[in-house]
Structure formats: structure tokens, C-alpha cells
Amino acid sequence: MRNKRPASFLALFLLLVASIAAQQPAAAPTYKFEEVMIPMRDGARLQTVILTPVDPKGALPILFHRTPYGVPKRPFEQIPPEIKELAQDGYIFVVQNLRGRFKSEGQFQLSFRVDLNDPKATNEATDAYDSIEWLVKNVPNNNARVGMLGVSYAGLTTAICLLHPHPALKAISEQASPANEWMNDDEHHFGALRESYVVEYAVMEQADKNRNTHFEFETYDTYQWYLDLGSLSNVNAKYLHGSIPHWNSTVQHPDYDEFWKKEAWVNQLHSSTVPNLNVAGFWDQEDPWGPWEIFRNAAISDPERTNFIVAGPWFHGQWYGGKGTALG
């Protein structure tokens, strides 16, 4: 005779799910908005927004997000759908502009270099470390436990913390993160320059520190614009005029030389230093290489089994803005 207990448990589970679904959704929590300038080890201060529940139920963990694209300018009018469930669990949300972006001081390098041997160096890993140190000491009602979460560039600024994590960093989820810009992330596909990506992206991040600048094409058909452009040197000769540092560096280093090897921060990763959930898309047009390299390198030493990856048939970051249950 078959055991009927699994069927009974399944029936009870389905009844429970139906009961929960029938309940009214919980009211969105109200958040206190605070903007601060957090000092780094070299004196530069980074623009940071702290969103704290007005009526917290005890000390809360901090969920930290570092981005080059801008921080919230006002309190949530409604909770963004991508963090709705996290908000219901109870977090202090912290969003920070990277060094040199918007009100953050210093120079934005659009660089992934990390020099673990130079105690005076500043980079995305040290800026995250210094920020977490400040947050756990200065944000009221936090429980000294920090998590980090991000997709794409914010996935990178999350993943790079694996190299030198702050003791208060307890878990991360790096998603669609680049790891090697020459091999097969963002700017190159195994050394072949993605011209139609790098030009626009470098302009967006480095033309004006106070906004995300969109390159103004002269034609609607971007593909045709690049066909008509001619030589790669015409990008600077006709349009950028040497004003975008990252574009200059990219075209000055067409081969996999020391410049790109130093940018490949993942080559310094040899262990899973923080419990981490990596997310990758099989159809990621931007970063098909990074998530797997991060996962592979973190697995070199993972005695506590804290290194995980989830992958699906998604384009770049598709799962973050929706359910991720369909393509297109």
C-alpha cells in the first residue's frame, strides 16, 4: 500500500497557500529618509541615502546597495516591487552613489581594480568596507548585520566585497555581475570590442558626474550609425574628442595586456568568504561570463558550503524587474 502521508501533507500545504493568498496584503511600511555623506579612508565622502522603517520591530539588519546610477531623492511613495518582500521582512535600506558619481566626492574611474597589497589604495572593495564600518556605528537601531544586493554594476560592487569583506557583512547576492571586461563581459566578447556598447556606456557614466548622460545619435538606426562611422578613431575625432577616460583606455589597450589583467578582479578571488547567492542568465547579453567565474573562483575554497548560484533562461537582470517566468 502506498503511504498516504505525503498526499495529506500536500493537501494541507495547498490549503495553507490558499488561505494566505486570500488574506489582504500587508500595508507597506513607512520609511524615514536621511541623506548623509559617509567618509572614506582617504577623506572622500560618498552620498548615501538611508531609509529606515518609522516603526521598527526591534533592531534591524541593513541591506546595502552601491550604484553609479543615482540614489533615491525622496522617501518611498510606495515600495518598489523588486524589494517589496524584503521590506515586509524588515530591513534598513541603504543606497549609495559610487565615488565620483552625483554628489559623491572623488573621481569615478569606471574601474574594477583592487590592490589587496596596498593599504592606502581606494577601490570599490575598500569603499564598501569603510561604508559598512560607518553604517553599523552610526545608523540607529541596526543590529550590526549587513547584507548586500545588486544587479549588473551593483552586482559587481556587491561581488567585489568577497575579496575583503567587513566582519559585519553576513550575506550577499551578486547578480549578473561582470568579472573580466576583456574576456566576455560587457565590453568585449573574447577580445572582440563591443563598440556599440562601450561608447554609449562610457559616455553615460563619465560625460557628466551629475547625471546619466545618453549619447545623442544622429540617426534612429544605431546599427547604421556605427556602419557609417568608419574607423574606430573617428569616435574621438568626431564626437568624444578625448573627453571620456574609459573610452580612451579601452581603445589604447586592444589586447589582453596588464591593463585588463588588473581589471579582472576575480582572479584574486580564491574562496567563499561570505555566504553568497549568485544569479546568472543563460541569455545575458551583457555579462555571460562574470557570474560563472565568480562562482567558480569562490568554490576553490568553500568548506562551509556557502557559495551558491541560480541560473535560468533570462536576459540581463530580467529576473529583478519581474517574475522571470517568461522571455521577452
Located regions from the model:
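Short beta-strand/loop motif that positions the catalytic acidic residue
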Residues: 272, 278-280
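Active-site-adjacent alpha-helix of alpha/beta-hydrolase-fold enzymes
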Residues: 289-307
